[in-house]
Regions:
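Acidic/aromatic-lined carbohydrate-recognition and catalytic surfaces
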Residues: 1-90, 97, 101, 112-183
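Hydrophobic residues within beta-strands of alpha/beta enzymes
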Residues: 107-109
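Active-site-proximal substrate-binding groove within the catalytic cores of carbohydrate-active enzymes
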Residues: 187-224
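Short, flexible coil/linker segments at or flanking structured domains
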Residues: 69-71, 95, 135, 189-200
Length: 224
């Protein structure tokens, strides 16, 4: 399991940044609001950011005594990695290297949908995200690692992702199966079995629960 988007605030890297601020070698490794919006963010910019939690994806931390708004997609304890930075990429590749050295054959990319931030976008499953996924898959192939993507998203996004990686989770199956069992109508789940990606991993439940988003309307495009 490789967590692409974030790492613990208790990690040695982030603790070094807290102590040394911009003097830390790891300073570029973590995203702040200003690193994504160097010229400031408008209300529209901030409102357009997709986040699976209430509120904005920032929390206050002091870097060598100076307050900074650190990007946190999930919780204040999970600080987001700048996957564009050399240090951020080196960290992710160190995980791949360790997995390969441990004879792992499959690697799951956790929260990768949030891993590529860009001003003026939703910062979730954007074209930049797909470039990140492709880059990670290329590195996986070099190390003999097959890539499994973990993304809760609109089903058409899942189909698109599946064409670019080795495996995706079939998160749409659990709610559709429950619907069939509770209503007696099997048409929706039967239709899904016709269009689901052939490289999908069957899922019946997860530690996050059963997600309605995976069979709902597109959270980023209400016209769909």
């Amino acid at each position: 399991d490789a967590i692409v988007n974030h790492m613990s605030w208790e990690s040695k890297q982030f603790q070094d940044v807290l102590a040394k601020g911009e003097e830390s070698e790891y300073y570029p490794m973590f995203l702040t609001m200003s690193s994504v919006f160097p010229n400031g963010a408008t209300q529209e910019d901030l409102a357009g950011i997709y986040r699976p939690r209430p509120g904005l994806p920032f929390t206050h931390y002091k870097f060598a005594g100076k307050t900074r708004l650190v990007w946190v997609s999930f919780t204040p304890q999970q600080v987001d990695i700048d996957t564009d930075s050399d240090k951020g990429w080196e960290y992710l590749m160190s995980i791949f290297d360790q997995m390969a050295a441990s004879h792992v054959s499959y690697i799951r990319l956790d929260a990768v949908g949030y891993g590529a931030k860009e001003a003026g976008t939703s910062c979730f499953m954007t074209p930049k995200t797909f470039k990140l996924i492709s880059r990670l898959r290329e590195e996986g192939v070099k190390r003999g690692l097959e890539i499994l993507i973990e993304v809760h998203s609109y089903y058409k996004k899942q189909v698109e992702i599946a064409s670019k990686v080795d495996r995706v989770y079939d998160f749409a199956l659990p709610p559709l199966l429950l619907h069939a069992l509770s209503t007696g109508h099997v048409e929706p789940v039967a239709h899904w079995t016709d269009i689901r990606p052939n490289n999908a991993v069957t899922v019946l439940d997860t530690h996050d629960g059963i997600g309605v988003i995976d069979i709902g309307s597109d959270q980023l495009d209400r016209s769909l």
